């Protein structure tokens, strides 16, 4: 192996880009870029049953959307292609035939029923199920007899007996396995397709990977891949297994867990910003030196240290993601926030797709009211709901405010003031509130809170005069008089 760092993200095209896979890609990307190395994307599509049409392109599109680029892959080619495993079968054939020739692999004619029976018997005896090796030493005659019966063989790797397979994991430290607990494993299925562990080991060697960074659910695959490397006399790459991502109940993220949005495409659809997601995912199981939490892509590349990958599970905190995204939204100018949010108002049917100049101005003012507090684009629909309703509902907290004794006087005087205004502007609305204070003697919360609750249905919200302007004189007066 040369000195240049070469790492890969190797998705299966089985669906959309999951947050956990995005993190794996991101840490490999940051490691490569921070070391001046190469980041490669390889498509692992050997499991044909699970592949989804468009899955590959969707994954690549959303890696780009997040802000990653790569040096070699299916879309741009490279020196060590093809980068799609389904196009590499002739390459794998050469290597498994070499193992067969050297006696390091063998043909296994066991049927699924025989293997299942063996497995059940081992479990009944309290043993860890593994292949017994009963076809390890078949004679040529026995093999021919099985073939004559119409049996198709798989090919198994001959696991050396009594061996310790150890490696120093970047994240976990020293990890070791006993070969006797593994059993001879299949490297080529009966249909001639290489298995995951075999294809990955061959590809990682031929593509000159120096490091393999992936989720800890792959730890059990590592000794098998190491043994394949060793069987060919190849240098073994450095492994690092990242901890799981867990939800707020400290349970492993499951695709069935609906408390967390798990696919990058969904975040895009909800109006999260790619830069914010990049930032948030970059801190899922990795921590910088110091307290700062907001970093650009360039800053991440500059400070990324693979040795600071966390040994503890990474907590996916939805509140934290919203906070991070809000920081990025606040940094946008109003035109950008309108571009982010307007499609969501249109999709929800709140505003039309063709807006007059007057309507555009109203929508811009509305969106600007919520610019500072907006967590993500689609949230604008919920935040601004009160501006699109004829009638509003008052919750218990709001009702309690409206039951205070000064309320009828405050609201009736304020309604009269609004009706008298020649122009309905925030400045004149603010002056009207002050006039109510002067006329009634009520001030502070006793004055502002009933007005806010009566007109908006909420006990807190954006600047009150601006909100009342956008609600409109007629609606505001009607709501004030209905209490």
Curated annotation (Swiss-Prot):
GO cellular component labels: cytosol
Subcellular location: Cytoplasm
Protein name per the record: Glutamate--tRNA ligase
Organism from which the protein derives: Bacillus velezensis (strain DSM 23117 / BGSC 10A6 / LMG 26770 / FZB42)
Main localization of the protein described in the UniProt heading: cytoplasm
A GO MF label: tRNA binding
Function field: Catalyzes the attachment of glutamate to tRNA(Glu) in a two-step reaction: glutamate is first activated by ATP to form Glu-AMP and then transferred to the acceptor end of tRNA(Glu).
Binding residues annotated for ATP, in chain numbering: 255
Motif ('HIGH' region): 11-21
Catalysis: reaction(s): tRNA(Glu) + L-glutamate + ATP = L-glutamyl-tRNA(Glu) + AMP + diphosphate
The protein's Enzyme Commission number: 6.1.1.17
GO biological process: glutamyl-tRNA aminoacylation
Position of sequence motif 'KMSKS' region: 252-256
Record-linked SUPFAM superfamilies: An anticodon-binding domain of class I aminoacyl-tRNA synthetases, Nucleotidylyl transferase
Gene3D superfamilies linked to this entry: 1.10.10.350, HUPs
């Amino acid at each position: 192996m040369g000195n240049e760092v070469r790492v890969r993200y190797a998705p299966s095209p089985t669906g959309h880009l999951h947050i956990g896979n995005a993190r794996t890609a991101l840490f490999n990307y940051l490691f490569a870029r921070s070391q001046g190395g190469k980041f490669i994307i390889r498509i692992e599509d050997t499991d044909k049953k699970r592949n989804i049409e468009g899955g590959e392109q969707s994954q690549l599109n959303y890696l780009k959307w997040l802000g990653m680029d790569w040096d070699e892959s299916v879309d741009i080619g490279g020196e060590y292609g093809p980068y799609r495993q389904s196009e590499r079968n002739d390459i794998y054939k050469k290597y498994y035939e070499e193992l067969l020739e050297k006696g390091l692999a063998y043909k296994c004619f066991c049927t699924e029923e025989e293997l299942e029976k063996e497995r059940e018997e081992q479990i009944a005896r309290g043993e860890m199920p593994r292949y017994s090796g009963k076809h390890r030493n078949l004679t040529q005659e026995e093999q021919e007899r099985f073939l004559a019966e119409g049996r198709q063989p798989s090919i198994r790797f001959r696991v050396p007996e009594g061996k310790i397979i150890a490696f120093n994991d970047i994240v976990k430290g020293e990890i070791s396995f006993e070969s006797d607990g593994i059993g001879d494993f299949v490297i080529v299925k009966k249909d001639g397709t290489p298995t995951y562990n075999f294809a990955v080991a061959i590809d990682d060697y031929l593509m000159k990977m120096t490091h393999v960074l992936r989720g800890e659910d792959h730890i059990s695959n590592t000794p098998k891949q190491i043994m394949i490397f060793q069987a060919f006399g190849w240098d073994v790459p450095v492994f690092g297994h990242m901890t799981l991502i867990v939800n707020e109940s400290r349970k492993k993220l499951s695709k069935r867990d609906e408390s967390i949005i798990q696919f990058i495409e969904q975040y895009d659809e909800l109006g999260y910003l790619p830069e914010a997601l990049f930032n948030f995912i970059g801190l899922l199981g990795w921590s910088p030196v110091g307290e700062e939490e907001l970093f650009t892509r360039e800053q991440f590349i500059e400070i990324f240290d693979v040795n600071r990958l966390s040994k503890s599970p990474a907590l996916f905190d939805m509140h934290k993601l919203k906070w991070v995204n809000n920081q990025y939204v606040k940094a946008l100018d109003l035109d950008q926030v309108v571009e982010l949010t307007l499609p969501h108002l249109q999709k929800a049917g709140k505003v039309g797709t063709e807006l007059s100049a007057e309507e555009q101005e109203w929508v811009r003012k509305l969106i600007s009211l919520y610019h500072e507090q907006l967590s993500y684009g689609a949230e604008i629909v919920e935040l601004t709901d009160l501006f699109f309703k004829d009638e509003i509902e008052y919750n218990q907290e709001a009702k309690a405010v409206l039951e205070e004794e000064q309320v009828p006087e405050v609201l009736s005087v304020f309604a009269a003031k609004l009706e008298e205004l020649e122009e309905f502007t925030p400045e004149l609305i603010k002056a009207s509130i002050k006039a109510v204070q002067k006329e009634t003697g009520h001030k502070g919360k006793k004055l502002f809170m009933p007005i806010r609750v009566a007109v908006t249905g909420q006990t807190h919200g954006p600047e009150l005069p601006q909100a009342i302007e956008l609600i409109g004189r007629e609606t505001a007066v009607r709501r004030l008089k209905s209490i």
